[in-house]
Amino acid sequence: MSNLPLVAIIDDDESVRATTDSLVRSLGYMVYTFASAEEFLRSNRIDDLSCVIADVQMPGMSGVELQEYLLTQGNRVPFIFFTAFPDERIRAQAVKAGAICYLTKPFDGDSLVQGLQAALNKQDGTGGL
């Protein structure tokens, strides 16, 4: 079994998943991608995750609804959100629930890398933002 951090990327846009997957893998992390929150919930990787990177607005369950669901199940995995439709109310809701960052698409890779590093530091107990 690998000790590499495991990151889930959830977005209904295949090109965003592929681009984000490439960036996160280039940092040396293991990645699983999912086209929806529901597909993610059917996976057997939920308890192994170090971080979830999710689109806010997706068909079916939204990224924020997924975060809330996992919290009700006792899973406090760090979340990074990105969205093409920024909404201050939703951002505040996500951050209040513990989101590490909330990025607007298109986002720059450095912002995602910083958020991911903060999430992984939070996950291993060394801090956060």
Regions found by a protein language model. Name each.
Residues 14-32:
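Two-component/phosphorelay signaling modules centered on CheY-like receiver
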Residues 89, 107-117:
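C-terminal output helix
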